[in-house]
A protein has these predicted regions:
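Short beta-strand/loop motif that positions the catalytic acidic residue
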Residues: 113-115, 120-122, 126
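Gly/Ala-rich beta-loop-alpha elbow adjacent to hydrolase catalytic centers
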Residues: 36-45
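Catalytic histidine-centered segment of alpha/beta-hydrolase-like enzymes
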Residues: 153-163
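Short alpha-helix in the alpha/beta-hydrolase fold that links the catalytic acid
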Residues: 116, 130-139
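Alpha/beta-hydrolase active-site loop
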Residues: 10-33
């Protein structure tokens, strides 16, 4: 589990904390060459792998990754009916705290620099991490990324689905 998730300790999580955790595990218990991630874990893994020395022997599984942080922020601001001034302050705070603008937190941005083989599982009906964020990555046809697109599983059932599990096992098989 990620920090502050499940049985893990901690009270706060964000993509940078999670990415740092991945680096810590890799440095102290690794090298880790195979990863499975879901949702924000996919974003954190992409940010971590971007800084890690790795090659095509590494294998990454993204299950419904939080592809574009901007999309999540847009949804939140729309849901809360907050105006553009609050959004500008929010974006500024993110950049002040992290050193990066919100759009930097993007799996799509990192995708071309990943050398590892990637299995990217995503559902067409995902209401948390929409397929529309993934489509530009699919269109790029990166040779190291294999997409497995499902329909009707949404954001959480996708990682419990037996066909998805089988696809992941096949991907990791020698």
């Amino acid at each position: 589990d990620a920090p502050a998730h499940g049985r893990s300790t901690g009270r706060m999580i964000n993509a940078l904390i999670y990415s740092g955790f991945i680096h810590y595990v890799n440095k102290n218990y690794g090298p880790v060459t195979n990863f499975i991630s879901h949702s924000m874990g996919g974003l954190a893994l992409s940010l971590a792998i971007e800084k890690m020395s790795h090659d095509e022997k590494y294998k990454l599984v993204f299950i419904a990754p939080a592809t574009e942080t901007i999309t999540a922020a847009n949804s939140l601001f729309k849901f809360l009916k907050l105006d553009h001034k609050v959004r500008e302050a929010f974006d500024k705070l993110i950049e002040e705290k992290s050193g990066f603008p919100p759009e930097w937190f993007s799996v799509a941005r990192v995708a071309p620099s990943i050398k590892a083989r990637v299995l990217w599982c995503h559902d067409k009906n995902d209401d948390m991490t929409p397929i529309t964020d993934v489509e530009p990555v699919i269109e790029k046809q990166y040779p190291h990324i294999e997409f497995y697109i499902t329909e009707g599983l949404g954001h959480r059932r996708i990682y419990r689905d037996n066909k998805v599990k089988e696809k992941i096992l096949q991907f990791f098989a020698p």
